[in-house]
Amino acid sequence: MENRTIKIKSKTNNNVRINIIPGHFATNHSHVNYYIDMTSLKTSYRMARDAAGELAMAYAHTTHIDTIICLEGTETVGAFLAEKLGHHGSGINEGNDIRVITPESNANNQLIFRDNIQNKIRDKQVLLLIASASTGKTINRSVECLSYYGGQLAGIAAIFSAIDEYNGIKIASVFDVSNIVDNDIVPYITLSPGECTMCKNGDKVDAIINSYGYSKL
């Protein structure tokens, strides 16, 4: 499977890269034809820093942010994003000490925050940062959590996004489906398991994937 890997570079910074692997992959709520491998971007401080710089441009002059909620292993990017926004010379967040937090998942797979950190959310302007937005379900779950704890959604950012917006809110991303199209390869698709054309064609599932990585079958 790994021998099918294709390297994709950001359109604005050649130092920011992800790998994509074509195939048949299953998440817990959809089937997709690419595994988006962000391992290097999440673990390399240089690449995470540069990716954060790209995301910061979407908010630096327009959006007040008190807190960044990091999901799907984006904490390193989130910390650099807070730094970029807080130290942007002419930005709206200049001098702000932006908080960077991560929720827990309880036994029912609900996102929760403990009592000691809830004051970083209540009545705060919150940016959601996720690794991948494909169906919007992770975003929906996060927005419900944010609403429960009294936070205000200021924006949504992703490393990779297959969707342009969520309920009218534009999703800022480092990579999107156009990065795949620009490399003259098959477009990215996401389907519900019951409507998966790859399953109907008898193509076996290559791996189960989530934000941590993949497990080959």
PLM segments and residue spans:
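Active-site-facing substrate-recognition patch
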Residues: 1-64, 211-217
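PRPP-dependent phosphoribosyltransferase catalytic core
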Residues: 2-8, 12, 143-217
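Short, well-ordered alpha-helices that flank and scaffold nucleotide-derived cofactor binding pockets
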Residues: 57, 83, 87, 144, ...
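Short amphipathic alpha-helix with an adjacent loop that forms part of the alpha/beta core around
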Residues: 60, 114-120, 187-190
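Short glycine-rich phosphate-binding loop at a beta-alpha junction
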Residues: 63-73
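Short, hydrophobic beta-strand segments that form beta-sheet elements in well-ordered domains
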Residues: 68, 99-102, 154-160
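Hydrophobic Val/Ile/Leu positions in short beta-strands of Rossmann-like dinucleotide-binding domains
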Residues: 70, 128-129
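Short, glycine/charge-rich flexible loops or terminal/linker lids adjacent to PRPP-binding catalytic cores
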Residues: 75-127, 134-140
